[in-house]
UniProtKB/Swiss-Prot annotation:
The gene is Rh3. Residues 369-383 have a biased composition (Low complexity). It is a multi-pass membrane protein. This is Opsin Rh3. The keyword Transmembrane applies. It comes from Drosophila melanogaster. Pfam families: 7tm_1. The keyword Translocase does not apply.
Amino acid sequence: MESGNVSSSLFGNVSTALRPEARLSAETRLLGWNVPPEELRHIPEHWLTYPEPPESMNYLLGTLYIFFTLMSMLGNGLVIWVFSAAKSLRTPSNILVINLAFCDFMMMVKTPIFIYNSFHQGYALGHLGCQIFGIIGSYTGIAAGATNAFIAYDRFNVITRPMEGKMTHGKAIAMIIFIYMYATPWVVACYTETWGRFVPEGYLTSCTFDYLTDNFDTRLFVACIFFFSFVCPTTMITYYYSQIVGHVFSHEKALRDQAKKMNVESLRSNVDKNKETAEIRIAKAAITICFLFFCSWTPYGVMSLIGAFGDKTLLTPGATMIPACACKMVACIDPFVYAISHPRYRMELQKRCPWLALNEKAPESSAVASTSTTQEPQQTTAA
């Protein structure tokens, strides 16, 4: 630990010697004051004009990320395990569910880099750590958005066209391959710095693609990645889930109208009422998924557009940590959406982890048979 302090002090002395403005006073220093000179070129100048945050802020964020990591890995690990191990859940549609949980899980694999940097007050792992952080973050972020879009497409087909829209294992595998092929060009371009690059942001403890360099190439890159990794998936998700919700409520309205014509209270039997409940849960889960996706990625999208095209002074180091926290928080919440809205997942989890005391009752066989088409969409909608 003592050698680490000596090293930090040495780098700090060299850095401030080359950048005298980095030390504002004995107590106040600019971000990057302790970064080795050869690493400074990888940091956008925008961040180097801000004073470093209090040590307690970095410690707080590091501790928060430890919590995010544990919660996400536990929750998504359970989802991957249960959906892969349970025969009743190994359906083609659920391959997409597993991939989404895998993306959320892998998103947190890189957080030890952030945690280490936070507890060492800055860019401690340097350019190599930044590249690893950026590669994993880009793959998981873009792949998660595309996976959500394909899940919405699959649910739309199964619910609105149950006879023609059935998913097969071949289709699901092809979608997964396409998702990672779709993400790869963006990652390779940034890693090789042929178009864009991975750079530290905020408190210099996390990394993302460069949205601050003031040139045409950077602005074009930001516009393209924003469109293809955010606008396209968001448009698909919004369209397909809105169609699902519209279909469910149109179906309910048609049944009510027919019941009125026949002077009966309801056309549904007890089995149909179970199906009705499932349909309402589909609608609620669809809205929840849309909301979570928007909450997690809209702040990042807005921030990158401001950096490339707007007033950069709005992007303070503290403000840019908020979008990063939003993404990690949603990666923690997603598994609990499964647990709340997917009875079959809850049943399988209860079998394997009885100590969780989920108390999920097995559905009646008649209800299961009648709602097989409905529950299958419900599984992936909860993704």
